[in-house]
């Protein structure tokens, strides 16, 4: 069984992604083994145990149930992303708008890569780099978020106050790296506050 598509276009999609304090992505809950997949594996084990050639039997069972696919490009036009990370030392949340980009060579047999760019607030810029196994994202996924020239009034909880003082103005540059290997998440980040001006104490 094989499905091959040249192009898929997503117009004005919306995505809400959140990393909680336990460093778990909300999107990971959407990826789970289906009952049919579990049943196939159970049947394969049972067949193998009764067969004189268990390896060949398991391979045959997998071959009969697998489904391969390929999509040349997935285009994203005018998308919105609500992004938040509660695991940072100062939790970060913002909205990315006018997201444009492409996910290339989506295939069930090898990693897929994509790049996306969007706007944050009035003048901020965001870039997202993505590499994952589309058929098994928990096994291997790499995501990099880059935020540049973000006005602090356009993000929370930085907006409003900082260390007990009102923020009059300031810019935020932030890089967030997430690397998932075999369901284990490792992350790193770089935070830079530029031209931060504090007002009265609150």
Enumerate the predicted regions with their spans:
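Secondary-structure transition motifs
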Residues: 1-98, 182, 193-202
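An active-site-proximal beta-strand-loop segment
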Residues: 122
């Amino acid at each position: 069984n094989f499905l091959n598509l040249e192009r898929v276009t997503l117009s004005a999609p919306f995505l809400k992604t959140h990393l909680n304090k336990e460093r778990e992505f909300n999107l990971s809950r959407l990826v789970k083994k289906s009952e049919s997949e579990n049943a196939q594996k159970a049947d394969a084990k049972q067949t193998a145990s009764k067969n004189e050639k268990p390896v060949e039997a398991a391979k045959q069972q997998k071959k009969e149930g697998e489904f391969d696919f390929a999509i040349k490009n997935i285009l994203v036009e005018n998308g919105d992303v609500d992004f938040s990370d509660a695991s940072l030392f100062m939790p970060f949340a913002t909205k990315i708008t006018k997201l444009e980009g492409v996910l290339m060579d989506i295939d069930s047999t090898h990693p897929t890569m994509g790049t996306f760019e969007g706007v944050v607030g009035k003048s901020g810029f965001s870039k997202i780099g993505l590499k994952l196994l589309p058929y098994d994202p928990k096994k291997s996924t790499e995501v990099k978020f880059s935020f540049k020239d973000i006005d602090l009034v356009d993000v929370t909880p930085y907006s409003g106050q900082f260390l007990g003082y009102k923020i009059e103005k300031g810019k935020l540059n932030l890089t967030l790296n997430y690397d998932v290997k075999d369901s284990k998440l490792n992350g790193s980040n770089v935070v830079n506050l530029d031209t931060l001006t504090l007002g009265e104490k609150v």
